[in-house]
């Protein structure tokens, strides 16, 4: 969008430092937070359509957004204490969707209202790792601890769970739109433990 990318130091000497990187000029500009800011060591960073950066961490109480032009960061409190976030994605409306690994749920931050909406997993200890919205009605996630692919209808709040045929240890998930009559999305995941690729394709809503 603007010739920059975002890089975050998760561990080591620069743990918690995010950089806005200008490839053409080879300039790395650190994001400086004021004293007293909430913890901000991101496990995952994502950019919206204007290249503003979102940050999440599975052990933190906030999600945060850094303005691409001013580098000012705003923190937003997650309603469920300790829910955190592991991986996520930004949709076409610049909403952040993320998996609440510790909180066993899905979170969504709307930048227009600056409000966070949460949905709790129907099965305890699912430990969702990643979440992605399909731009229609469903958000997909996967259980790191129980090998469930999970589809949430965000309009009705209804969950559908699909037990995978073998141990997968789900991490990153990918959503694909379909040309079927119901415009249903499908779910792709790579097996962390088995080297296999699994595709879950619902045929009905």
Model-derived features: where do they sit?
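Short loop/turn segments that connect beta-strands within beta-propeller blades
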Residues: 22-26, 67-71, 110-114, 153-157, ...
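A short loop-to-beta-strand structural motif that recurs across blades of beta-propeller domains
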Residues: 16-19, 62-65, 105-108, 147-150, ...
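Solenoidal tandem-repeat scaffolds enriched in leucines and small polar residues
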Residues: 12, 18-23, 28-32, 37-68, ...
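C-terminal closing repeat unit and adjoining cap/tail of repeat-based domains
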Residues: 145-193, 200-205
């Amino acid at each position: 969008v603007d010739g920059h990318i975002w890089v975050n130091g998760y561990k080591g000497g620069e743990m918690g430092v995010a950089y806005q990187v200008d490839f053409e000029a080879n300039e790395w500009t650190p994001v400086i937070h004021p004293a007293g800011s909430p913890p901000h060591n991101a496990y995952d960073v994502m950019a919206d359509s204007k290249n503003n950066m979102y940050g999440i961490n599975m052990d933190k109480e906030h999600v945060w957004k850094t303005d691409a032009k001013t580098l000012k960061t705003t923190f937003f409190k997650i309603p469920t204490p300790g829910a955190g976030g592991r991986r996520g994605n930004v949709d076409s409306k610049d909403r952040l969707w993320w998996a609440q690994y510790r909180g066993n749920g899905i979170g969504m931050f709307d930048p227009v209202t600056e409000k966070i909406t949460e949905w709790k997993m129907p099965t305890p200890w699912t430990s969702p790792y990643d979440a992605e919205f399909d731009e229609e009605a469903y958000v997909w996630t996967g259980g790191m601890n129980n090998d469930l692919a999970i589809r949430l209808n965000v309009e009705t709040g209804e969950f559908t769970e699909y037990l995978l045929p073998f141990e997968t240890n789900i991490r990153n998930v990918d959503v694909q739109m379909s040309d079927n009559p119901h415009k249903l999305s499908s779910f792709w995941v790579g097996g962390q433990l088995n080297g296999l690729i699994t595709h879950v394709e619902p045929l009905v809503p």
